[in-house]
């Protein structure tokens, strides 16, 4: 089992390490109970946390746990990237490495990710889905050393959101075991993007990418894994 990031700072939020411990423990129960109050209760028990703390830490229940899981995964991805013996210097290679790290680290919890995306794909959670997608691609750009501001700040993230969300769908369907199909898919997508830093999609592309991502999740995964 990969090392988990227990504490991180997400945009505008300092995440409680107790909440992180519950989410990490809950992952073992999601394949059986889905992202649910029951799974959270079991995770809290495994983490040695009193039951009453669950509702305090996750007032909206499972959807709050899903959001925290995504943010912890972002932190783990960034930490793993900076721990590489040699980080890629070219932007497209750094982005490639970050996307693959994000997915490789999630490989052991693939079913939990699938179920999380099923919930995020519901219309009621479209806004949160877009926010989490934005946070992930923003973390990727910043880890790659891109601190641009102004128009390019948004255009680059909109382009990366499209590449990452499409690759995530490919990863969910990849049963190769070694992610070979996912890697090939990502490389094709990156090749199709002539230059991510020169992308010209408007600001609204970030929001549109998130909403399109949510709809794609709902259509692709459907209700097969809804609990």
Predicted regions and their residues:
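N-terminal intrinsically disordered/low-complexity leader segments
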Residues: 1-16, 203, 210-211
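Short, amphipathic alpha-helix enriched in basic
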Residues: 8-52, 60-67, 71
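Amphipathic alpha-helical packing segments from all-alpha helical-bundle domains
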Residues: 124-146, 154-161, 165
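Amphipathic alpha-helical segments used for helix-helix packing
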Residues: 105-127, 131
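Hydrophobic/aromatic-rich alpha-helical bundle segments in the mid-to-C-terminal region
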Residues: 146-208
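Long, charge-rich low-complexity segments
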Residues: 198-227
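Hydrophobic alpha-helical connector segments
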Residues: 80-115
């Amino acid at each position: 089992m990969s090392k988990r990031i227990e504490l991180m700072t997400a945009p505008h939020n300092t995440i409680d390490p107790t909440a992180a411990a519950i989410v990490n423990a809950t992952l073992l129960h999601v394949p059986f109970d889905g992202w649910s109050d029951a799974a959270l209760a079991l995770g809290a028990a495994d983490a040695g946390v009193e039951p009453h703390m669950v509702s305090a830490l996750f007032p909206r229940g499972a959807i709050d746990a899903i959001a925290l899981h995504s943010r912890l995964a972002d932190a783990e991805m960034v930490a793993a990237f900076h721990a590489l013996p040699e980080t890629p210097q070219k932007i497209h290679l750094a982005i490639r490495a970050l996307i693959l790290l994000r997915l490789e680290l999630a490989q052991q919890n693939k079913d939990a990710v699938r179920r999380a995306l099923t919930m995020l794909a519901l219309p009621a959670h479209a806004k949160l889905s877009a926010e989490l997608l934005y946070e992930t691609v923003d973390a990727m750009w910043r880890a790659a050393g891109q601190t641009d501001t102004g128009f390019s700040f948004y255009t680059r993230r909109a382009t990366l959101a499209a590449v990452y969300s499409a690759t995530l769908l490919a990863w969910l369907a990849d049963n190769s075991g070694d992610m070979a199909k996912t890697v090939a898919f990502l490389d094709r997508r990156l090749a199709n993007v002539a230059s991510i830093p020169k992308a010209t999609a408007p600001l609204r592309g970030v929001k549109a990418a998130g909403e399109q991502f949510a709809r794609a999740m709902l259509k692709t995964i459907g209700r097969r894994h809804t609990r």
